[in-house]
């Protein structure tokens, strides 16, 4: 049996991993009955792909551009020696995930380090140390890449890439929330599973409730994000346009045209047909918004992954779902309810503090 061990400090990726592992278990192509995700304290790398009983197949370190730049400055870049030592003992493969927007300007400064220097360091990891370097966009993308690696190592899949690449409703709603400046994939996921946009713009999410929102590491949301959410609940037109532009097939220009004369709440309180008949002025003609776009707007602005949203604020049925969209994802799979907060208390550590165990591991 194969399993993935995640370091308990990976708060930003673990929520995505729980969902992705849940989805993987329901993939008919995956023959293993259980796709195990274990959350423990690691001292080498951030993730280990393992095979029962004690074989380490791969060790993965995840760094954002800022982390990578900081490690170059303070010498923590040399911590790769721990990974190299683990490979020598177990014959496992080594991976570096570098997380951030693709291909910034080489002269761009990241934490006072030029991106060109980060590229050079990444090249050295591949050429000199024979460490695979994989670039990812954000936490959600890192989780997807981890699952793809798990697929490949498990050798239980006919193909490495999941059979369907169509984004789920949850992923589309996370992207919608992330269209607001300052909202990361992690915060977007929390919002997508806590309330709908309709819930927020109608004022049903109070300032007190917004103030109580927490990140996976139990920290309050950034003040900028909380101020922005409160501003949306009070009808900030500019932020409403940004949110609406996050709906599939609705860009900023079209969102601004839709909200030219009315607030977002006005359309959410109207039948879909009312929204479908909005006149959109183009260069050479005027067209209607249309039912497909109108249904998508109503569906995604009312979408919420939480089962605790009340009926009056989440009155969406499967019948109202746009036919062109994929089926909604199931609720977040609870691989380990208390894993993040109690990992160090309930799980034995893996790493150099228990190196005697690692040294007994079979070679991959």
UniProtKB/Swiss-Prot annotation:
This is ERCC4 domain-containing protein EP364R. Plays a role in the inhibition of type I interferon signaling pathway. Mechanistically, specifically interacts with 2',3'-cGAMP and cleaves it via its phosphodiesterase activity. In turn, prevents 2',3'-cGAMP interaction with host ER-resident STING1 leading to inhibition of downstream signaling pathway and type I interferon production. GO terms for cellular component: Holliday junction resolvase complex. Belongs to the asfivirus EP364R family. Its EC number is 3.1.4.-. Residues 319-352 are annotated as: Disordered. GO terms for molecular function: 3'-flap endonuclease activity; crossover junction DNA endonuclease activity; DNA binding. GO terms for biological process: DNA catabolic process; double-strand break repair via break-induced replication; symbiont-mediated suppression of host innate immune response; symbiont-mediated suppression of host type I interferon-mediated signaling pathway. Induction: Expressed in the late phase of the viral replicative cycle.
